[in-house]
């Protein structure tokens, strides 16, 4: 049974499911023209050593993960997988102001060839507990995404970068996730969408597809997350 929603949960749910009229993604592409960009996840046995505090805590913490830079290098995503978990570290280099609970990152996955269902994981800056939502290609448009209990061993935390950060010494927003892949269905590849928000400024993967802090990109416009050695599923 889903627990009673607190104020933060309600705010997060509204942030995710609200889709303005006139659309939020670029209208100069169609699913027939869109070619899904791909991210490669690295297999890394160092991921269990991650200190989940929202920052790059020590020199080698995220070193054995794939490096992905988007939006002119302002959004940096490190990705790795190990023992049926997906690990994400997201840096928003532009966000140097701390708006606790308002700055956030959402990462969404859907197993390829697994139907239209997808799961979104939310980490908010300054909060140690993330949130999980489930939806499908229809509910993304009609506001029907549902807040569900977090899967066991899920971590979603937002914080401020430390002096160990590899990209910018000025303190900025950083987010860390540990997502149990078994909870959404093990697969070799996933449809993948990520969005990090600083007030009205939005950065995404795939890049430049949304300009609003609200809503989820339609599933057909998502990118793809996979591993070269087929070790993710």
Regions found by a protein language model. Give the residues of each.
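Secretory targeting signatures
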Residues: 1-24
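Short, intrinsically disordered, low-complexity terminal segments
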Residues: 8-11, 39, 137
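Acidic/polar low-complexity flexible segments
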Residues: 24-53, 106-135, 170-172, 181-233
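Surface-exposed, glycine/proline- and aromatic-rich loop segments on solvent-exposed faces
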Residues: 34, 58-139, 197-203
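Disordered, acidic Ser/Thr/Pro-rich linker "stalks" and the adjacent N-terminal cap
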Residues: 50-54, 58-60, 157
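Extended low-polarity, hydrophobic cluster-rich segments
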Residues: 73-79, 155-157, 171-175, 179
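Short, hydrophobic/aromatic-enriched beta-strand segments in well-ordered soluble domains
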Residues: 90-93, 177-181
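Glycine-aromatic-enriched beta-strand/loop faces of beta-sandwich-type recognition domains
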Residues: 128-171
